Amino acid sequence: YENKQNLGWCSAFDYYKQAEKNSIYNTPPVFAIYTTLLVLRWMQNEIGNLQNMEKINNQKAALLYNVLDEIYQQNQFYIPQVPEKYKESRSIMNVSFHLQNAEITQKFLQQAEQQAKLFGLKGHRSLGGIRASIYNAMPLKSVELLADFLRDFWNKNK
């Protein structure tokens, strides 16, 4: 601490002062830190490493985009938010798409919940449509269930 310089920082970022007083300026976000610990342990024990997580996430996204693109090419029943020709710009965490109108979109959301127990698919309020959030903790089996539902709903409503 001998070379301490007063840099004019606010006291929350003056780590010299905190170390000197053997105290911290504020309480750290302990719940967020604990949750992060649990997620990192899960990733280490179940997934192995970040490269494996990336492979799994790419696999989940590809599964949904392949179904959407295949059906779009046949009759444009599902309309991906980002077209296939721009697939390098597609999100692997949020797969967004539209149906042909608000009525069929509402029917899709209702049947997804009632028949397949798929919840939280309603798109962002400013964009509408459907948004499947397939973040790290979403198992591949759940994404497969959604892909099956997409095909089944299309077959019954095309």
Question: How would you name each of these model-derived features?
Answer:
Residues 1-65:
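Active-site C-terminal subdomain of aminotransferase-like
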Residues 20, 91-95, 128-130:
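Short amphipathic alpha-helical segments
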Residues 36, 95-98, 134:
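Short, well-ordered beta-strand elements within core beta-sheets of diverse protein domains
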Residues 45-47, 65-84:
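PLP-dependent aminotransferase class I/II
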Residues 75-111:
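Conserved PLP-binding catalytic core of the aspartate aminotransferase-like
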Residues 107-115, 145-151:
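Short amphipathic alpha-helices in soluble, non-transmembrane regions
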Residues 110-126:
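Short glycine/proline-rich, acidic loop/turn segments that cap or connect secondary-structure elements
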Residues 124, 128-158:
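PLP-dependent enzyme catalytic core of the Aspartate aminotransferase-like
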